[in-house]
Amino acid sequence: MKKIYVSGNGNVSWEKFQQFYIEPLKKFNLDECEFIIGDFSGIDTLMMEFLKDKTEKLTILHVGKRPRYFANSFKTKAEKWKVIGGFTSNYERDIFGIDLCTHFLAVDFNTDEKRKSGTLKNIEKCFALNKIKV
């Protein structure tokens, strides 16, 4: 079972989501994958919408008491998704998700010379722990 941690920026376009997230997943049998994602707008919410009718094997990680977003679960596989919350920071949540995964799917569009995005930090952590890039 591949455990795929999905990370990405909030300001991604639909076209970039398709190109950098959906296209790489096409080489996998989704029945052999489990997904671990956050609850932020952008990649997380787009991935929830993409996966809600494709898999029950998804865990949403969130800071605080409840997720900021959850896909409609009426007559979808999302009704079986797991939710793990109570993290005190995005960093704590991301480390937890990275520790759980065997693979990762992440692309950074926001880092520049002044700022390293959380997505890039997650990519670096995954590589440092020898996680497999999707």
Protein language model annotation of sequence segments:
Residues 1-2, 134:
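Short, Lys/Arg-enriched, disordered terminal segments
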Residues 2-10, 37-38:
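Short, hydrophobic/glycine-enriched beta-strand segments
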